[in-house]
Structure formats: structure tokens, C-alpha cells
């Protein structure tokens, strides 16, 4: 189930994301470092040494796509008029990932690695943690549901 965010939580969520969203390469690097099984799902990166590809153009482009997706979703959250756009984005993510054999467990691994990254790059305290937990609970509720029903 989804729990609405207060205006203060929403503002903190968005402003804190804005402080890290340009660290695309570092975010994806942290996810791959913690989860080689996720890296293995990307044909252009499978089986390659992570440190040797981190500074490549391909890695930068793909990092931008992944982090850009989160930025787009986060930008739309909080305005009920944006729900159709959010649904379209999330349904597209779910169907493209299901087609590539990505499972719920890998989304959960991604989430855990993202939180770990955030906890080291934001002013992490109980308020920040609870805000991100709530926001990601809501986002992943929709993402995992869409993954389940995707064709």
C-alpha cells in the first residue's frame, strides 16, 4: 500500500535527491559493486571489470538513463495531475525489465544499494532515513506491482 507523504517529507525527498542526482556514474557503480548479478544483466557490462568500465562513455550514458529515470519520477511525484505520466513511466520500466528477465529480487537489491549510497552522500539522520524509506516504499510498491502484471 502507498502512504501519502507530508509536504515537508516531499520537499526533503526532492531536495535531497537534487544534491546527488548528478552523481549518476557513482550511483550505478555503487549498485554494480554491491550486486554483480545486476551488472551481469547488462550485456555491454557483463563479465567486465567494473573499475575498468566506470569511466567509459557507455557507462556514463547508461548511468544517466537509470538515474534520469529516477529524476523524472521524483520530479513528477507530489502532483496528482502527474499520475498518468508516472504510471506510463513505471509501466514502461516494468515491461522492459520483465522482458529482459529482471526479477523483483534485483529491484530490491538495487533499492538497498541506492539507500546505502544515499546514506553515505546525504546528511543522513532519522528524518532523512524515514523520508527516503517512505518515498521508496511508495515508488517500489508501484514498480513491483507493474513488474508483476507486465506482459
From Swiss-Prot:
The keyword Transport applies. One of its GO terms (molecular function) is metal ion binding. Residues 4-148 form the Globin domain. It holds the Pfam family Globin. Heme b binds at residues 62, 97. InterPro entries: Erythrocruorin (IPR002336), Globin (IPR000971), Globin-like_sf (IPR009050), Globin/Proto (IPR012292), Mb-like_M (IPR044399). Keywords: Heme, Iron, Metal-binding, Oxygen transport, Transport. GO terms for cellular component: extracellular region; hemoglobin complex. Belongs to the globin family. There are at least 12 different components in Midge globin. Homodimer. This is Globin CTT-VIII. It comes from Chironomus thummi thummi.
Amino acid at each position: 500500500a502507498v502512504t501519502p507523504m507530508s509536504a515537508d517529507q516531499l520537499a526533503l525527498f526532492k531536495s535531497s535527491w537534487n544534491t546527488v542526482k548528478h552523481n549518476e556514474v557513482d550511483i550505478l557503480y555503487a549498485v554494480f559493486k554491491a550486486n554483480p548479478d545486476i551488472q551481469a544483466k547488462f550485456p555491454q557490462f557483463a563479465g567486465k571489470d567494473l573499475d575498468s568500465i566506470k569511466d567509459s562513455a557507455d557507462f556514463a550514458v547508461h548511468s544517466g538513463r537509470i538515474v534520469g529515470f529516477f529524476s523524472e519520477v521524483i520530479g513528477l511525484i507530489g502532483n496528482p495531475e502527474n499520475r498518468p505520466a508516472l504510471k506510463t513511466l513505471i509501466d514502461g520500466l516494468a515491461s522492459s525489465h520483465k522482458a529482459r528477465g529482471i526479477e523483483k529480487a534485483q529491484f530490491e537489491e538495487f533499492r538497498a544499494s541506492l539507500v546505502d549510497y544515499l546514506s553515505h552522500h546525504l546528511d543522513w539522520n532519522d528524518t532523512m532515513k524515514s523520508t527516503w524509506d517512505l518515498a521508496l516504499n511508495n515508488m517500489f510498491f508501484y514498480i513491483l506491482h507493474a513488474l508483476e502484471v507486465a506482459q
